[in-house]
Design a protein with these regions (language model features):
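Phosphate-end processing signature that detects enzymes handling 5′-triphosphorylated RNA
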Residues: 1-158
Length: 158
């Protein structure tokens, strides 16, 4: 069954990766993009396969997710544009029942990490104070969205 949701999130670079990552739930993720405008993403998360369409937006985006089979995933994977992303996503509990999704990338993006936090409302997102291990906020920098990372790689530091 498909689901349509608004995704409200903030994204940060990582100043310091927390210790003892093995104590947190971790997903192995492989994803690629059939299109980046609009964003049409294929994702394998462990043994789960999802086709996602996202609207444009900065902090708030409409997201439509459709579970697909492994066979459908493999057939659609041939349509992926550019590079793919491989990452481990760690779910780290924060205060106020929030969860930090720490992504540590592999392959072409090795040694890169970022962290996202999803919120129930824009107000909650605005009021959020990131923990000390979070680095610079990049929510409004489209160069750090996964579609851009897949298409262009890491932004150059200027």
């Amino acid at each position: 069954m498909s689901k349509e949701i608004y995704e409200i999130e903030r994204k940060f670079l990582v100043k310091e990766i927390p210790n003892n990552l093995q104590q947190y739930k971790c997903y192995k993720i492989k994803q690629g993009y059939i299109s980046t405008n609009p964003t049409i993403r294929l994702r394998q998360r462990d043994d789960e396969y999802i086709l996602t369409v996202k609207s444009s937006g900065i902090m708030k985006k409409l997201e439509y997710e459709l579970p697909i089979t492994e066979e459908q995933f493999n057939n659609l994977w041939e349509k992926v544009e550019g590079n793919t992303i491989e990452k481990n996503r760690y779910l780290i509990p924060l205060k106020d029942n929030l969860v930090a999704e720490l992504d540590i990338y592999g392959a072409d993006l090795s040694n890169f990490a970022n962290v996202e936090v999803e919120f129930n409302s824009t107000k909650d997102a605005i009021l959020f104070t990131p923990p000390d291990w979070f680095g610079q906020e990049v929510t409004q920098n489209k160069r750090y969205c996964n579609a851009s990372l897949a298409k262009y790689g890491l932004p150059s530091k200027k």
